[in-house]
Every structure is written in structure tokens, then in C-alpha cells.
Amino acid sequence: MIDKETEKKFLEAEKYRVNKEFEKAIDVFKAILEQFPKLPPALHNLAICYTELKKIEEAEKCYIKCLEIKPVSILSVNNLGKLYYNTGQFKKALPILEKSLLMKEDQETVIEVFAQCLFELNLTKAVDTFCVRALKKFPQNKNLKTFYGKNLLRLNRHNEGQKYLNESTGMIEFGEKDFKID
């Protein structure tokens, strides 16, 4: 439990973070963590500040430490997965995103990112299997249809792939007389 003074500092740091004054927020969060080194909200928000400043290694360390203290924090799991994804570290992102989906399986955005990581790593069979399952849960998801369609093209299943790409992007096949783009 934190005292009133620390709570006041935390709110000050949050104000800096929201106003994109990340260096100031970092200073305050670090001061809080000197007194309360195992305070997940301070670690998590410090990681967000580092991420915004493109200090990826520092952000990663904060998220990992946060998860060591509170392993069930789905927000920290998702943000660590997002950090890896946004920095092109798809192999590192996959197990983190998988952990997130085990914690809560109906996260549509996490499912999209997981599918894209599989796609970027050219894991065609895994993309195929994963997207089939995901599209049963989210049949209108255009991003999943796009990854699945592109993956089907990679697998030389061109007709099926084109069908999913048409559904997801509104592409028009040559030779169609009537077409509609939503």
C-alpha cells in the first residue's frame, strides 16, 4: 500500500505522461520506484514512457520486471507483445501474445497481431490453421481475411486467396460487370 504523498507523486507523473512530457514522468516514476521498487503500475507506466521515447530496451526491462511481480497483468503482457511487434521482433512477440490469449481468448486486436506475426515470419501452415480458427470467432474481421488471403496465395491456393482478399479489401476481379465497394 502506498502513502498519500506517493499517490500524489504518481498522479503528477501520470499528468506528465498524458501531456507527453515523458522525461519528467520518468523522473517521477523512478523516484516512486526507489521507495516502492515492486509497484507494478509505476513500472508499467515507466515502460510506456520509455516506449514513447523509443528506449526499447528500458521499456522491455520494465515490462518484464512488472510481469515478474504481477504475472497476471494482461495489460503488461499485451504491451510487451505490442512492443516486440512494433519493433519487428515477431519471434519474441509470439509467446507473449499467446500468453495473453490464454489469459483472455476473445481479444480481437491481439488475435490480429498474432496472425500478422505468424504471417511476417512466413509460418504458412500456422497462419492457415490460426486464421481458420480466428475467422470462425471473428468472421467479419478484414485484417484476418487479408492475412489469410495473402497466406493462401503463398500456398498457391490462388482462387481461395483472391476470394478472401476481395472480401477484405474490396478489390475488383477483372471481368466483373457488377461490383460494389463498401
Question: Which role fits each region the language model picked out?
Answer:
Residues 31-32, 65-66, 99-100, 133-134, ...:
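Canonical positions in the second alpha-helix
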Residues 35, 69, 103, 137-138, ...:
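Structural marker of alpha-solenoid helical repeat scaffolds
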Residues 5-35, 41, 48-52:
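Alpha-helical segment of the N-proximal tetratricopeptide repeat
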Residues 18-19, 52-53, 86-87, 120, ...:
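Register position in tetratricopeptide repeats
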